[in-house]
Amino acid sequence: MAAWACSPASFAAQAEPGKGLVLAPRQDFVAPPAGSYQLPIIQPAANGWVLDGNWLPRRLSSYTHGALTMLSFVYTYCTDPMGCPLAYETFATLRRLVLADPLLHGRVRLVSLSFDPAHDTPQEMVHYGGSNARSKVLPWAFLTTYSVNFLKPILDGFGQDVEVELDDKGKPTRTRTHLLKVFLIDAQAQVREIYSAAFLQPEVMMTDLRTLALERAGLPRKS
């Protein structure tokens, strides 16, 4: 995996999908048919206290149980096109694909959780989400935490590294360096796949979602 440094800047112009952002470069890999393979359990999804868009405290487990979940960590002022904006645009593409898929419609949620609770208040996260944060058709939760003390156990539980860069005087800046990861979580809150930036391909992710949906429905696996 590669590390992507995200520089502080306004994300407002990029917060809505379809505004010039690009998805990850296409890979030659072609996913096998949905249901023809298994996704083993990697680890339990981490839990902890988060804040929703109304400043209400919620357990993260309420966003990782009961549905197939795609979760990523972001921060709203990241502008590196292969960092947080890539995660956002990929989720926006997934949302459109899921809504058009009868097997997945009503069975999938998206979660974007902030790396920077000091800046990314619930209001900032709602603004970052735009119309996607308000949609009732397919849940896309834009969450933050009270503080780094609440965030760190969640990051540690997922194995998501992040570093705050220092300036020439050794003082913290607002630039965060992290490995872009997206976590696929099943309805029992078990992580079943972790995607890096290089493999953030909506078509592959859709096939994995369909595989877990078939598994949950108890339908025969394809040979």
Predicted regions and their residues:
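N-terminal targeting signals for export/organelle localization
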Residues: 1-47, 51, 222-223
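A local structural motif
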Residues: 42-45, 136-140, 165-171
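Sec/Tat-exported extracytoplasmic proteins
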Residues: 43, 67, 74-77, 82, ...
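Extracytoplasmic
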Residues: 43-45, 63-70, 105-108, 120, ...
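Residue-level recognition of short loop/turn positions
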Residues: 54-55, 188
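Short active-site neighborhood of thiol/selenol oxidoreductases, capturing the structured segment around
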Residues: 59-90, 110
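Structural microenvironment flanking redox-active thiols in thiol-disulfide oxidoreductases
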Residues: 86-154
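Thiol-/selenol-based redox modules, centered on thioredoxin-like
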Residues: 156-223
